[in-house]
């Protein structure tokens, strides 16, 4: 499964597709992903897993267009309190967004996280 989503397979995706990986960092050819994002073939991507982890500050993924990186937090939703807390935060943020109020845990783009 290493690089199962490679340049050839990304080319088969429709223009404007999105790629999401919450499984294994090795499943995606990251160089091919960067090229597909930068060329505009892919509209965006979200990665919760990357190679290496943690991702170095100067890694090319950090400069890729339309890429959302999360810090490997998509795991173990089977723990009751984790699931409940995530749902609670999502609902609160949805209500806050709809009402024009500040949301919890926003990314500070100036800081990069």
Language-model features and meaning:
Residues 51-113:
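C-terminal helix-to-coil terminal segments
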């Amino acid at each position: 499964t290493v690089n199962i989503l490679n340049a050839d397979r990304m080319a088969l995706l429709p223009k404007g597709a999105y790629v999401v990986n919450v499984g294994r960092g090795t499943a995606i050819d990251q160089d091919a992903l960067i090229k597909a994002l930068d060329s505009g073939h892919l509209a965006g991507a979200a990665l919760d897993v990357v190679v290496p982890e943690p991702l170095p500050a100067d890694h090319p993924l950090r400069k890729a267009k339309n890429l959302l990186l999360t810090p490997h937090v998509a795991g173990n939703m089977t723990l009751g309190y984790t699931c409940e807390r995530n749902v609670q935060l999502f609902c609160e943020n949805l209500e806050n967004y709809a009402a024009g109020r500040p949301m919890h845990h926003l990314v500070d783009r100036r800081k990069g996280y």
